[in-house]
From Swiss-Prot:
Disulfide bonds join C108-C353. It comes from the Bacteria. GO terms for biological process: rRNA base methylation; tRNA methylation. This is Dual-specificity RNA methyltransferase RlmN. Residues 101-348 form the Radical SAM core domain. PROSITE patterns: RADICAL_SAM. It catalyses: adenosine(2503) in 23S rRNA + 2 reduced [2Fe-2S]-[ferredoxin] + 2 S-adenosyl-L-methionine = 2-methyladenosine(2503) in 23S rRNA + 5'-deoxyadenosine + L-methionine + 2 oxidized [2Fe-2S]-[ferredoxin] + S-adenosyl-L-homocysteine; adenosine(37) in tRNA + 2 reduced [2Fe-2S]-[ferredoxin] + 2 S-adenosyl-L-methionine = 2-methyladenosine(37) in tRNA + 5'-deoxyadenosine + L-methionine + 2 oxidized [2Fe-2S]-[ferredoxin] + S-adenosyl-L-homocysteine. S-adenosyl-L-methionine binds at G179, E180, S211, S233, L234, H235, N310. It is found in: Cytoplasm. Pfam families: Radical_SAM, RlmN_N. SUPFAM superfamilies: Radical SAM enzymes (SSF102114). Keywords: 4Fe-4S, Cytoplasm, Disulfide bond, Iron, Iron-sulfur, Metal-binding, Methyltransferase, rRNA processing, S-adenosyl-L-methionine, Transferase, tRNA processing. It comes from Bordetella bronchiseptica (strain ATCC BAA-588 / NCTC 13252 / RB50).
């Protein structure tokens, strides 16, 4: 007799959980209770859900699990950034990064193991593509981090959000980790809905950001299904250069991308799109590039976020000097373009932008470096 795979409750959004509970004859309020236990209280045992009927808990224990990916290691940066390495099987891993700041706590999560887009400046893309993550594996990163951070005495707390907490540790979630979220849309969508659900994490749409390299048809779908803040990996002001840096541009060139951004803004929670621009020495950082970028940015309401490149050997690229970045940023601001320069965080644990999973396949380097700076997971369990 074949065993039936149990349902992982982490991956069910409110509608799917209500449907499951309804199949057992349960009322919608039972699904909401269950959702609060799983996502707000971080329960991983049905026995702990003492306000649920005993027979309902028994049904859950038979048919369901609450299970995140196994965590191999946690690393802490000197600047307070924390990174978890999750095992996705077959020798592959994904990474999740928590970035604490005075006014926010941002969790950067992954949507794929590896990435198929293969941007030239991104270490993650150079590792190749393994598989899409399931919704339970995507939201499981938030579930895990919330439990661990709330249990840590040294984690700063911020004013609460819609979900009813007096305080919260994670105030923002960005899908800027491994993978292209919009190429795993069917699994990303329920995860986003859980992030926004008042019975789960209760985050504002303005505080959840999906970053895309420009999958135009799925940008349009997201604007209808679950419009959250949008960041676009731009990195070049013209098609010829972007074709080289972001190969997806050959399928969805800049004219199509900018038109999709304009359509998205009609539904977006913010009145601008964030354009991410990785600063590469001599490649996309000249005065001419700045002039072209100004012309492009004037076509859509946007903010430019300049990102210092994090070098890795296989790229053959170098980071723009700090002075060049400052001049480039000033050119944009003088033209009236809202511009920020991203502060690098966690680069001593390879948690900075473009570095995720850069060591995942290099087991020797991982072992050597973890021996000196990794915190054993058993010390940080909630």
């Amino acid at each position: 007799m074949e065993s039936v795979e149990r349902v992982n409750l982490l991956g069910l959004d409110g509608a799917a959980l209500s449907e499951l509970v309804g199949q057992w004859g349960g009322k919608p309020f039972r699904a909401r209770q269950l959702q609060r236990w799983v996502h707000q209280r971080g329960a991983d045992s049905f026995d702990a859900m003492t306000d649920l009927a005993r027979d309902f808990r028994a049904q859950l224990a038979r048919d369901c699990v609450i299970e995140a990916l196994p965590v191999n290691t946690e690393q802490r940066s000197s600047d307070g950034t924390r990174k978890w390495l999750f095992d996705v099987g077959q020798g592959n891993a994904i990474e999740t990064v928590f970035i604490p700041e005075d006014d926010r706590g941002t969790l950067c999560i992954s949507s794929q193991a590896g990435c198929v887009v293969n941007c030239r400046f991104c270490s993650t893309g150079h590792q190749g593509f393994n598989r899409n993550l399931r919704a339970s594996e995507i939201i499981g990163q938030l579930w895990w981090a919330k439990r661990v951070l709330e249990a840590a005495a040294d984690t700063a707390r911020l004013p609460g959000g819609k979900a009813g907490e007096d305080t919260r540790v994670i105030s923002n979630v960005v899908m800027m980790g491994m993978g292209e979220p919009l190429l795993n849309y069917d699994q990303v969508l329920p995860a986003l809905r859980l992030m926004l659900d008042d019975n789960a994490y209760g985050l504002s749409r303005r505080r959840v950001t999906v970053s895309t390299s420009g999958v135009v048809p799925m940008m349009d779908r997201l604007s209808q299904d679950c419009p959250v803040a949008l960041a676009v990996s731009l990195h070049a002001p013209n098609d010829a250069l972007r074709d080289e840096l972001v190969p997806l541009n050959r399928k969805y060139p800049l004219n199509a991308l900018l038109a999709a951004c304009e359509r998205y803004l009609a539904h977006a929670p913010r009145d601008f799109i964030t354009f991410e621009y990785c600063m590469l020495d001599g490649i996309n950082d000249t005065d001419q590039h700045a002039r072209e970028l100004i012309q492009l940015a004037r076509q859509v309401r946007c903010k430019l976020n300049l990102i210092p490149f994090n070098p890795f050997p296989a790229s053959g690229l170098k980071r723009s000097p700090s002075a060049r970045v400052r001049v480039f940023a000033q050119r944009l601001m003088d033209a009236g373009i809202v511009t920020t320069v991203r502060k690098t965080r966690g680069d001593d644990i390879d948690a900075a932008c473009g570095q995720l999973a850069g060591e995942v396949r290099d087991r020797t380097r991982i072992t050597e470096r973890n021996a000196t700076r990794t915190i054993p997971i058993q010390q940080v369990h909630a």
